[in-house]
Amino acid sequence: MPTDTRLGRVRAELRSLLVLATPIIIAQLAHTAMGFVDTVMAGRVSPQDLAAVALGNSIWVPVFLLMTGVLLATTPKVAQRFGAGDEAAIGPLVRQALWLALAVGGGAAVLLWNAEFVLRAMNVDPALVTPAMGYLRAVACGFPAVALYHVLRCFSDGLGHTRPSMVLGIIGLLLNIPANYIFIYGKFGLPAMGGVGCGWATALVMGFMLVGMLVWVRWAPCYRASALFARFEWPQWLVIRRLLAIGVPIGVAVFAEASIFAVIALLIGGLGATVVAGHQIALNFSSMVFMIPYSLGMAATVRVGQALGRGQPREARFAAGVSMGAALGYACLSASLMLLLREQIAQIYTPDKAVIAVAATLIVYSALFQFSDAIQVTAAGALRGYQDTRITMLLTLFAYWGIGLPVGYVLGLSDWLGAPSGPSGLWQGLVVGLTCAAVMLAIRLARSARKRIRQVI
């Protein structure tokens, strides 16, 4: 193939990828900002309210990630049907996914409502248990709604329409601020709820986003061919079981990645407030930087799934490669900026020189794993497009929990290889774990792509 033609294909695919990914990036940043707003507004009430919200977040966010990961199975299935031109089959599939969302969202809500035993097992200050549970139970009321919203979002994403989630995410963020104010301080005849009010505001925003997405999907012309609202159907276990076969491994893999950072935070907790603060700064900034390759991975799911639906496995492999290349290009930029501006980044969060020193050191490790993180998250997204999720889950679990965490513990907290290096050793373990995940998932993606090409030949 001539070089000009090849470059033209890359540019065209990159353009299509970014058209999908840009709204996803904005939506993810809006969702992240909601948590930031809750933290800031609760902190202005009292340290106790801030602590209660932080404790509640540490419980409901992992549950949310597990739940939404399971429901992500909707995206590749919709994308493949859309790519195949079989839009009539999309409506029945999504109707079953909505039943699954109702069950998973309701189950998650019940779990959060009864999560007091988790707080007590964590030896949380008894004075914080009641406000933390009030916050959790308020958020739990919104979980069925946000589960249903997420399926509709996956339906829209699978069709290649990612703008609705961006618009609703921005409006949700703008709604969250006044809702927090009303519930926290007790306006319009409501009692002042403090940090618990942040939970009710979050639940309200979840409900609003569901209503907004329902209206969008119901009336926008681009969804009519799918006939989602054409008829009512009772749950069909066979279809739901197929969704679970794809979705449960996705949920477990997402949960495994998120929870390892939580475990490392707990391990660092015994090293002093300065170390914990530095770790939190590095982790918070890394999480924001991660939103872009994560969004590219979500877009890769759609591009790969649609290409496979069209019966073009070579185009699917090409789309996966371009998504990984785009993520690596971004990683070069983000890693360079993090290395050059690590102290300035830490200074945004705190004026404390000791905390800045710790955070700047850990940001170096974050810069190092930008490349492996970019590869693993886009490879995982592309593998979802292939509906290859079970092995992906096993590889992810092994990389993070079988390699990364043990290496981090040995280097950071044990004297097996010399004096323990504290937080640096634990973050070195993250670098090793993410690198192993990147290598294994890239190999798995290459094999899955070759297998689908051979099936066509």
Give the role of each language-model region:
Residues 47-58, 136, 199, 273-288, ...:
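Small-residue hotspots at the loop-to-helix junctions and early N-terminal turns
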Residues 50-109, 113, 146-165, 278-342, ...:
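Small-residue-rich hydrophobic transmembrane alpha-helices
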Residues 29-51, 119-126, 182-193, 251, ...:
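Helix-terminus/linker motif at the lipid-water interface of multi-pass membrane proteins
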Residues 19-38, 138, 142, 149, ...:
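Transmembrane helical elements of multi-pass membrane transporters/channels
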Residues 1-21, 78-144, 190-248, 304-369, ...:
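Short alpha-helical transmembrane segments in multi-pass integral membrane proteins
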Residues 68-71, 75, 139-157, 165-173, ...:
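Short runs within selected transmembrane alpha-helices of multi-pass transporters and secretion channels
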Residues 25, 29, 33, 37, ...:
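Generic alpha-helical transmembrane segments of integral inner-membrane proteins
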